[in-house]
Swiss-Prot record:
This is Fibrinogen beta chain. GO terms for cellular component: extracellular region. Signal peptide: none annotated. GO terms for biological process: adaptive immune response; blood coagulation; innate immune response. Its main location: secreted. It is found in: Secreted. It comes from Ceratotherium simum. The gene is FGB.
Length: 10
């Protein structure tokens, strides 16, 4: 899956 949320959480 795409960790778009994780990228936004940086």
């Amino acid at each position: 899956h795409d960790d778009k949320a994780a990228v936004d959480a940086r």
